[in-house]
Design a protein with these regions (language model features):
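A cross-kingdom marker for long, charged
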Residues: 24-358
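Hydrophobic membrane-insertion alpha-helices, especially the h-region
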Residues: 12-22
């Protein structure tokens, strides 16, 4: 190697090291914020509340998850309903430690506004039908359960989740520097509020619009490839599986798209990635690019017209996004982010335990 190339190589090396160190520092920042918030919430509770909130890291309940109402799926953990107002604020600080501003706004809109709208809408429908306003599913904005698994700390492996109807977010932390944030589920019923003071409100508007933008940007031949079936599935395909393998390759590849279409596909992925803190989002996007964007696929099921029942998914070597809007006559969304290696921090915990063993 000539002397004149040394500075260039040295500079590249510095940039690589800086990038790695920046990622570690960023992850450490999020992990530290999570631990601080979780410990503050734990400290605020009496023994009975702490017993509900805190479970061992190896609890079988850590990977038991769902997105249906609690009346259909009894949950462990401490619900907002049983917290004092100061404790609720601490629980929300924990939620904020993991999410971007948009992610927090989306999540709390589902928890608060949509549950209340659904409760009132269903009660009015029952009363109009002569069944009375009582009965049906319990729709309660305070029935969202927080659970901490293990002991939050700088060197510890631990995790936490928040879950209730249409929200199921899972986080695993190891060594105080690494965070896995999957699976992540958000739902919206209705997808669009059709009446009342909040008419027109859509909690998951970006997820819906960005997906449609991709399929509508395709030419006729590309669309025939992307739409792998004319009938959308009744729900997300992976449902509440603990682990998820890549689904059968369907749809149009990134390589078969033009530059504008590729830009729209990456923008769609970013909608999901950017629900998390900037640190987590940057790591997710870096992992996607490292695995090869040319391996990404976009698949659509059902009609493309607005209001029709439809489904789409984006899949890469490391992750899967599913979006389904088929229930309630095409006005009820389920969406999920799955990580093939790190749902519930599977690989993260394996690496942590291997390091501790040595």
């Amino acid at each position: 190697m000539s002397r004149m190339n040394w500075p260039r190589v040295a500079t590249a090396g510095v940039l690589v090291v800086a990038g790695v160190m920046g990622s570690i520092v960023a992850s450490q920042r999020t992990a530290s914020a999570m631990a601080t918030s979780a410990n503050a919430l734990l400290k605020s509770l009496d023994p009975e509340g702490r017993k509900k909130l805190a479970l061992p890291l190896d609890s079988s309940d850590r990977t038991r998850w769902n997105f249906v109402p609690t009346s259909m799926f009894p949950r462990q953990g401490l619900p907002l309903k049983e917290m004092t107002e100061p404790q609720r604020k601490l629980a929300h600080e924990l939620l904020r430690s993991a999410l971007s501003d948009r992610g927090y706004t989306t999540t709390t809109a589902i928890m608060n506004e949509l549950e209340a709208i659904l409760r009132d809408t269903e009660a009015a429908a029952r009363e109009a039908s002569g069944r009375g306003s009582a009965g049906g599913q319990v729709r309660d904005p305070e029935l969202y359960f927080f659970t901490v698994f293990g002991t939050p700390g700088e060197k510890a492996a631990w995790g936490w989740r928040v879950e209730g109807h249409h929200v199921s977010l899972h986080f695993t932390v190891a060594n105080g520097t690494s965070v896995a944030a999957a699976p992540s589920f958000w739902g919206s019923n209705p997808a669009e509020v059709r009446e009342g003071p909040r008419k027109g409100f859509r909690a998951l508007d970006k997820e819906q619009d960005a997906g449609r933008a991709v399929v509508m940007a395709l030419d006729e031949a590309q669309r025939k490839t992307a739409i792998y079936t004319e009938t959308a599935p009744n729900d997300i395909i992976t449902m509440t599986a603990v682990t998820t393998d890549p689904l059968t390759p369907e749809g149009l590849t990134y390589s078969a798209m033009n530059p504008k279409q590729r830009e729209l596909l990456m923008a769609l992925i970013d909608v999901y990635v950017s629900q998390m803190t900037a640190d987590i989002a940057a790591e997710r996007m870096a992992a996607i690019k490292k695995a090869g964007v040319e391996k990404l696929t976009f698949a659509w099921a059902g009609p493309v017209e607005p209001g029709a029942r439809h489904y789409y998914r984006v899949q890469g070597p490391t992750f899967l996004i599913e979006f389904d809007n088929t229930q309630n006559n095409g006005n009820h969304i389920h969406s999920v982010w799955r990580d093939f290696a790190n749902d519930f921090g599977r690989d993260l915990l394996r690496e942590h335990l291997a390091a501790v063993a040595h």
